[in-house]
């Protein structure tokens, strides 16, 4: 029997989000974390069908739309990409909220979105831009040294912004859209060095995002973010910007409520600020998403790549 998966695609600052509206199997009525675990354990091929070629792309982030646990929440969502599952996704949440409005599910205002790492608060503004009040962000360790194969010693901060990041300012790389290959090679080597050295986030959390920062003539900073699976973020990265704000706050370089304009490697911009909280900060990220497609993915029984090209 042919499988059908309904999707709506959007992009946030150039970074695509694929919202899965229907077609996935039931994951039960647990929390988003529990449902994510069921999806990963029992139905992972649905993730690969949506995200991997020939129907998807390494760049894309998937977002499975779920009924929320709390009646006060507008939706639940499980994020995933070509390599696995994400706890939270800032650009993806912006895309999800914009798409929920397109579907007629929400109007401008404040909405709660359940994710595997907690409930985030998102505001859909009248101009259809979206502000996401993220989960607690904090710096776990400062100036951690790691030996990077082929590059030598590198120092960076380890911070949580919804995913684990290694943030580097002194890297000697040119952060520009025409230098992505070199940036990817360098960031991949950093991640390999962290893994070899056994350097992790809190409680052994895998540091699967590498973030490089540089000065920018028009904005506060420009960044390159390597995501899990070796794809880079076209957007400024919501969770990465949250992690950056946590480091700035810890160093006393950014006061609560002051807007930080973070540019991506391709020039798209998020506006970010934070409120102080016990154990860290609560960041708010504002950006815009645009709709790009509505489609039904078809998976024929005899298609050898129906569930994706899995390497």
UniProtKB/Swiss-Prot annotation:
Q: Which domain of life is it from?
A: Bacteria
**Any one Pfam family match given in the protein's UniProt record, by short name:** Pro_racemase
User: Which InterPro entries does the UniProt entry name for this protein?
Assistant: Pro_racemase_fam (IPR008794)
Positions bound to substrate: 90-91, 209, 233, 238-239
Q: What class of enzyme is it?
A: isomerase
User: A GO molecular function for this record?
Assistant: 4-hydroxyproline epimerase activity
Q: What is its EC number?
A: 5.1.1.8
**Keywords for this protein:** Isomerase
Coiled coil region boundaries: none
Q: Report which reactions are catalysed by this protein.
A: trans-4-hydroxy-L-proline = cis-4-hydroxy-D-proline
Q: Where is the active site?
A: 89 (proton acceptor), 237 (proton donor)
Q: What does this protein do?
A: Catalyzes the epimerization of trans-4-hydroxy-L-proline (t4LHyp) to cis-4-hydroxy-D-proline (c4DHyp). Is likely involved in a degradation pathway that converts t4LHyp to alpha-ketoglutarate. Displays no proline racemase activity.
Q: Tell me its family.
A: Belongs to the proline racemase family.
* Name of the molecule in the record: 4-hydroxyproline 2-epimerase
| Organism of provenance | Burkholderia ambifaria (strain ATCC BAA-244 / DSM 16087 / CCUG 44356 / LMG 19182 / AMMD) (Burkholderia cepacia (strain AMMD))
Q: What is the lineage of its organism?
A: Bacteria, Pseudomonadati, Pseudomonadota, Betaproteobacteria, Burkholderiales
């Amino acid at each position: 029997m042919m499988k059908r998966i309904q999707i709506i695609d959007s992009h946030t600052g150039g970074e695509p989000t694929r919202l899965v509206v229907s077609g996935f199997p039931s994951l039960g009525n647990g929390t988003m974390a529990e449902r994510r675990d069921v999806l990963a354990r029992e139905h992972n091929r649905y993730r690969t069908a949506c995200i991997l070629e020939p129907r998807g792309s390494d760049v894309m982030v998937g977002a499975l739309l779920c009924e929320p646990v709390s009646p006060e929440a507008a939706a639940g969502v499980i994020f995933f990409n070509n390599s696995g599952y994400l706890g939270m996704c800032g650009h993806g949440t912006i895309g999800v909220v914009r798409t929920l409005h397109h579907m007629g599910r929400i109007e401008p205002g404040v909405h709660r979105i359940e994710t595997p790492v907690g409930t985030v608060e998102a505001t859909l503004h009248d101009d259809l831009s979206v502000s996401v009040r993220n989960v607690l962000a904090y710096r776990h360790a400062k100036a951690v040294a790691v030996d990077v194969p082929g590059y030598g010693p590198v120092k960076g901060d380890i911070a949580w912004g919804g995913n684990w990041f290694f943030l580097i300012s002194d890297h000697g790389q040119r952060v520009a859209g025409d230098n992505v290959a070199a940036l990817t090679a360098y960031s991949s080597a950093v991640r390999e060095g962290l893994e070899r050295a056994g350097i992790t986030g809190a409680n052994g959390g895998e540091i699967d995002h590498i973030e490089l920062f540089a000065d920018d003539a028009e904005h506060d900073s420009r960044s390159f973010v390597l995501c899990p699976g070796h794809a880079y973020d076209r957007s400024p990265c919501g969770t990465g910007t949250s992690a950056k704000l946590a480091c700035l706050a810890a160093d006393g370089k950014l006061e609560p409520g002051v807007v930080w304009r973070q540019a991506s490697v391709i020039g798209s911009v998020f506006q970010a600020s934070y409120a102080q909280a016990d154990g860290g900060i609560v960041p708010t990220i504002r950006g815009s998403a645009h709709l790009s497609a509505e489609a039904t993915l078809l998976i024929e029984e005899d298609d050898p790549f129906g569930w994706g090209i899995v390497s």
